[in-house]
Amino acid sequence: MSTARDERPNILVLCMDQWDVHMDLPPGVELPAIQRLVGAGVSLANQYCTVPQCTPSRAIMWTGQHAKNVGLWDNTNFAWTDVLDEAVPTVGTMLREQGYYTAFKGKWHLSHPERSSDALEGYGFSDYQSWGDNWGGPLQGEELDGTVAFETVDWLRHKRPRDRPWFLVSSMVNPHDIMFLRAGPDERPHANGAMAALTHPPQDLGFMREYDIELPGNFSDDLEAQPYGVRSYKRNTDWNYGRIPEGREDLWKVRRNYLINCLRMVDAEFQKILDELDRQDLWRSTVVVLTSDHGEMNGGHGMTQKGAIPFQEASIVNMTVVSPRGPSGDHSDAVGSHLDLATTFLSWAGLEQADIRERYPALKGRNLRPVLEDPRRSDPPRGSASAPGDGALVNWDGLNMLDPEWAIQGALGELAQLGHGPDRTLEDCLRVGETYGAPDMDKRTFFRAVSDGRHKLVRWFSPTRYETPRTVPELHATSDVALYDLLEDPGETNNIGDPSRPGYDEELVASMLKKLVHLIDTELGEDERPFDLDLFGTREVRYRPEDVATDAPAEEQPAEPGPGTTEQPGDAF
């Protein structure tokens, strides 16, 4: 039986952007808002974001469908990605159908909304900020999160309905300001790096604090045991954002310290919202969800950023829920997915699982509500680290990180519109193809990964091999494979999925492959390539190793051939 309408809770989602939830905070870091929520609610240790990048992850969060299935498999800032179709049901439209008033404040990044409070009505959300989207450009967290907090408090105080339950998203940018940080002059991007012109030094603000920073245990991973796609990701971020030279651990500590301060800034904004909940005595009628769209590598494996990387730092996000019916200060090792958010919201809105399946058949997520309200007596629907089950699916199909050697010829920079108006049209892809040729579509830099809390299997593949292998021989014939024991090897440095390496476990590969195939079949469906291989009007790869090395940052070394490709400029760390 559905929950009585007058007992259904309000739902407030506090969303941050790009926090490394695995980071051990040094002594002296105070996060009063986040610490209060953790102390008052239930936190999941294994919540996966499904795609570790802004637009795709937010598409999943607010539609309940995998990003590729709604056309948002890369950021809307790139020419090959459209905006979210208003015909796609969202959490806003679905909850409106259940009688909720739905509103959205802050970072959206699924379209290019007009500067109007009605800009998201077509997506099921009212009361958007009239000054437009804060998509996450340089220093936008510092500059605009305070305004989002003000808008949220004002809405709670003056605009929230009193006659029906409501759903409100308050979506901050920080700690995303870490994305464009340049820790010092020696952290140098490639001259043609797509993000080079956007980087900035640390801010000299009175609010900032210096902490006793330690580097993560897997910082010194030499990546020799990792698949080609991992090393390609490293080149991509080094060249486009900035490479820290060997021996400059001080700059890595600057980055980690800056990320903490960005988190402190967003915590201060969340505190304003929690204070308003106190003033209006809303805790007894409101479920508060604290989460993030994705993580941040933050020095893990000697890397920065997020995107085409399946490691825990980028793919696991914070997930804390304070519910009027839930316990306080509890933790669970349950595995969850951002695909589950929409289903869980609808459960709080009073729908039973059978009703959700009937009314919204496109939703493939699980209901996390039982484990979030009673973690000690509920069986997690995806299993847990202590009792593994189906696990969670993590994907990558983004062209922006497919081929870093092609990107730094200047191609990616010409196809990115980072906050300067509408995306370039697909005709620009043809123009760029004429100038630079195509990216190498044989590079194995896309992935499908499954984590059940105990183990993680990653299938790295190229855009030409979208078929789903169902046997171990098929898997190795079409893919680079990684398998990690997350209990024995939490830093993911020992790949036991590579037949050429010691410790290879074929039986475990087969077991995890079965889980991966099951999630692809039941959640993604037909796993087809979301773009045309002839997108650039050619498939010719024109760059040569010397083209890259000529203008590379100092100390770069050329050449590691990639799978199925000609010689490629390579792994210089």
Spell out what each predicted region is:
Residues 2-9, 13-16, 21, 43, ...:
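Long, internal low-complexity/basic segments
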Residues 5-6, 18-28, 161-164, 172-285, ...:
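Active-site-proximal cap/lid insertion segments
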Residues 11-17, 95, 107, 167-170, ...:
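A short aromatic-rich beta-strand->coil structural motif
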Residues 20-24, 53-58, 69-72, 102-104, ...:
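Short catalytic/ligand-binding loop motif for oxyanion handling, primarily in non-cytosolic enzymes
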Residues 22-58, 64-65, 69, 99-103, ...:
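Short, structured active-site-proximal loop/turn typified by the sulfatase FGly-forming signature C/S-X-P-X-R
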Residues 60-166, 172-196:
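Catalytic-site neighborhoods of secreted/periplasmic enzymes
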Residues 62, 69, 127-135, 271-274, ...:
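Substrate-binding rim/cap in mid-to-C-terminal beta-strand-loop elements of soluble/periplasmic
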Residues 186, 312-313, 395-498, 554-555:
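C-terminal, low-complexity/hydrophilic appendages and adjacent surface loops
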